[in-house]
């Protein structure tokens, strides 16, 4: 469990497909059912979003999913309980994507205890600057839960090295300057940026934000160790187009076999 479980998802040259689901969108039973589906479909890690009223890094699709969850009365406590229940059925690593405010409102120690009970292996906090990591990083290290760092296109290489020097799990490389969401084209500068990150960090590098098509996945996966697909997965789940999610997962698996 924990950091080692995330590392295992990348062992022996494995490429990771990491779908994002919003916790509580459609209800907590739906969250458990979606995690079971993604596990059976062959996803490597599942990223579970914690709904928040001011999601500054999220694009419109994820914002709407978070609002649906909050409007239905979903709580962080309820999400943890759902994860505790589904954890007994699946082995797929869990990574939570949460803003800092819900963690502090819940209580840091209580949050981490709940992560341990629910079998959470890592967390991503997009609005936690590197300079303020000590708010939660030492507690996570003791619990063997990875604090996944985010690096961006605009990050100088010295900062990327600094941010990732003591990190665990994988590096989340944000492939756009802006919020999440579906995008049509990735420029050559993104390829150059990802190659630069790969060269200077000691962890697997996962590309995320705006990846939505098989072609984008195939392009990213030749440079990176994995991809996060968020807005597109939420759209496909909402519209019950699960076979298309399976096709995206297969796009990653096929690159391993090539």
Swiss-Prot record:
Q: Which UniProt keywords apply?
A: Amino-acid biosynthesis, Aromatic amino acid biosynthesis, Lyase, Tryptophan biosynthesis
Database matches in SUPFAM superfamilies: Ribulose-phoshate binding barrel
Q: Where are the transmembrane segments?
A: none
Q: Which reaction does it catalyse?
A: (1S,2R)-1-C-(indol-3-yl)glycerol 3-phosphate + L-serine = D-glyceraldehyde 3-phosphate + L-tryptophan + H2O
Q: Which terms in the Gene Ontology molecular function aspect does this entry carry?
A: tryptophan synthase activity
Query: What does UniProt list as catalytic?
Result: 47 (proton acceptor), 58 (proton acceptor)
Pathway the protein acts in:
Amino-acid biosynthesis; L-tryptophan biosynthesis; L-tryptophan from chorismate: step 5/5
Matching CDD domains:
Tryptophan_synthase_alpha
Which is one Gene Ontology cellular component term of this protein? cytosol
The family database entries (Pfam families) matched by this protein are listed as:
Trp_syntA
Q: What is its EC number?
A: 4.2.1.20
Task: Report quaternary structure and partners.
Answer: Tetramer of two alpha and two beta chains.
UniProt xrefs under NCBIfam families? trpA
Family recorded in the similarity comment: Belongs to the TrpA family.
Q: Which PANTHER family match?
A: TRYPTOPHAN SYNTHASE ALPHA CHAIN, CHLOROPLASTIC (PTHR43406:SF1), TRYPTOPHAN SYNTHASE, ALPHA CHAIN (PTHR43406)
Q: What does this protein do?
A: The alpha subunit is responsible for the aldol cleavage of indoleglycerol phosphate to indole and glyceraldehyde 3-phosphate.
Q: What protein am I looking at? A: Tryptophan synthase alpha chain
* The species this protein was found in: Bacillus mycoides (strain KBAB4)
């Amino acid at each position: 469990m924990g950091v080692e479980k995330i590392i295992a998802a990348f062992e022996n040259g494995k490429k990771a497909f990491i779908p994002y689901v919003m916790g509580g969108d459609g209800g907590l039973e739906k969250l458990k059912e979606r995690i079971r589906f993604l596990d059976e479909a062959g996803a490597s890690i599942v990223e579970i979003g914690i709904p928040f009223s001011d999601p500054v890094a999220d694009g419109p699709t994820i914002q709407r999913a978070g609002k649906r969850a909050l409007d239905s009365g979903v709580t962080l406590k309820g999400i943890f309980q759902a994860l505790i229940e589904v954890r007994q059925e699946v082995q797929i690593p869990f990574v939570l994507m949460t803003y800092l405010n819900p963690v502090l409102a819940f209580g840091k120690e209580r949050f981490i205890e709940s992560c341990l009970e629910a079998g959470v292996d890592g967390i991503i906090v997009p609005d936690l600057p590197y300079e303020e990591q000590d708010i939660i990083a030492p507690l996570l290290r003791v619990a063997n839960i990875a604090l996944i760092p985010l690096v961006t296109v605009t990050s100088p290489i010295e900062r990327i090295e600094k941010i990732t020097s003591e990190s665990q799990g994988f590096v989340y490389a944000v492939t756009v300057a802006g919020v999440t969401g579906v995008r049509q084209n990735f420029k050559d500068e993104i390829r150059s940026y990802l190659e630069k990150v790969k060269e200077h960090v000691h962890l697997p590098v996962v590309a995320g934000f705006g990846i939505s098509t098989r072609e984008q996945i195939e392009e990213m996966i030749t440079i990176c160790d994995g991809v996060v697909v968020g807005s597109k997965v939420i759209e496909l789940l909402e519209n019950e187009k699960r076979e298309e999610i399976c096709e995206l997962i297969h796009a990653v698996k096929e690159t391993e076999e090539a």
